[in-house]
Amino acid sequence: MKTFSAKPHEVKRNWFVIDATDKVLGRVASEVALRLRGKHKPEFTPHVDTGDFIIVINAAKLRVTGAKTTDKKYYRHSGYPGGIYETTFGKMQQRFPGRALEKAVKGMLPKGPLGYAMIKKLKVYAEGSHPHEAQQPQVLEI
């Protein structure tokens, strides 16, 4: 018996929509990363992008446990000496709702060209509406 290896042009991609209202950030991110990677499919192949498209709505209503709203820090650097910036989860959710989820999912995906292709299939929206009704996404409960 030969080992099955999925071919990129044979992969069937489904669309799923997740409502993130009052869901914990890490639990949503891990499920999204698993589905973007395609590990839930029997034809999963590590070197082929077999994942599905994921739409996350109500990302502004994500929550974290404990005191992470004020204690969890995100860092970025301008490239200049002394140009490090930090912001908390709470401030990031106010300014850019959904970016914390994008960063969490991106950290769970492989680094390199395959991971970059996977993160492009994630669509995050702060409100409860999205422009992907034509794809007829299935509701995914977490």
Curated annotation (Swiss-Prot):
GO MF: mRNA binding; structural constituent of ribosome
Any Gene Ontology CC annotation: cytosolic large ribosomal subunit
A Pfam family reported for this protein in Swiss-Prot or TrEMBL: Ribosomal_L13
Record GO biological process: negative regulation of translation; translation
N-terminal signal peptide: none
The entry's keywords: Ribonucleoprotein, Ribosomal protein
Coiled coil, from the record: none
Stated family: Belongs to the universal ribosomal protein uL13 family.
HAMAP family: Ribosomal_uL13 (MF_01366)
Record's protein name: Large ribosomal subunit protein uL13
Taxonomic lineage: Bacteria, Pseudomonadati, Pseudomonadota, Betaproteobacteria, Burkholderiales
